[in-house]
């Protein structure tokens, strides 16, 4: 299993740095965990976006899904012609939120580009040789951490979360922990994020 961090900026992209987006590859399987602002450009440096096997979105904040709109265009206007719908896994209601920002025609095109699967906390999904487990964490509404398993390797991507039992449970046994550390230590406890010390 190979992890490529495509973006780790908080809320908005910094100069030269995209928002949340992480590529996990194993064999011929390529899974994108979150697809925030600027991620698609960075993805294109390491993988043709049309080669993705699936996309997983952690929650309803735009800095974690903004480039899904650009990905839809990449799939629709691929040189080989429109591609089959790409599996898109996300919490209940998030796709509706994403579609609501578009015109009726735009929402229709978005729905055609993706095979939408609304995840329930605890759900286990197989994508090629990878197993992805959706683990509830504490941020806003339904927010999911993703545990990706490949043979004996176990990666935990916490997504945005406060420190608590939920994220500890998700991270237990991880070979690699990719953790939210948005808040400076001086702001610990002021928002549903972890500090570097907590992470």
Regions found by a protein language model. Name each.
Residues 38-87, 173-175:
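Active-site metal-binding motif and surrounding structural segment of the metallo-beta-lactamase
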Residues 40, 68, 95, 143, ...:
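A general structural signal for well-ordered alpha-helical segments in protein cores
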Residues 84-87, 91-143:
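Metallo-beta-lactamase
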Residues 8-9, 36-38, 60, 93, ...:
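Active-site metal-binding loops of divalent metal-dependent hydrolases
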Residues 1-50, 143-159, 176:
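Conserved beta-strand hairpin/beta-sheet module of binuclear metal-dependent hydrolase folds
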Residues 62-65, 123, 140-142, 162-166, ...:
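Active-site environment of divalent metal-dependent phosphoester hydrolases
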Residues 56, 133, 157:
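Conserved Rossmann-like nucleotide-binding pocket used by diverse enzymes
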